Amino acid sequence: MVKTVAVMVGSLRKDSLAHKLMKVLQK
């Protein structure tokens, strides 16, 4: 699941929200 999210975030890394989400998920 995390890997799928990472891929999605990578595809939408343009969005700042995605970046913030990844940070929260990593925490």
Swiss-Prot record:
It catalyses: 2 a Fe(II)-siderophore + NAD(+) + H(+) = 2 a Fe(III)-siderophore + NADH. Its EC number is 1.16.1.7. Binds 1 FAD per subunit. It is an enzyme of class 1 (oxidoreductase). Coiled coil: none annotated. Induction: By Fe(3+) ion deprivation. GO terms for molecular function: ferric-chelate reductase (NADH) activity. The keyword Nucleus does not apply. Keywords: Electron transport, FAD, Flavoprotein, NAD, NADP, Oxidoreductase, Transport. Its cofactor is FAD. Homodimer. Reductase activity that acts on Fe(3+)-chelates and uses both NADH and NADPH as electron donors. May play a role in iron uptake. This is Ferric reductase B. It comes from Paracoccus denitrificans. The lineage of its organism: Bacteria, Pseudomonadati, Pseudomonadota, Alphaproteobacteria, Rhodobacterales. The gene is ferB.
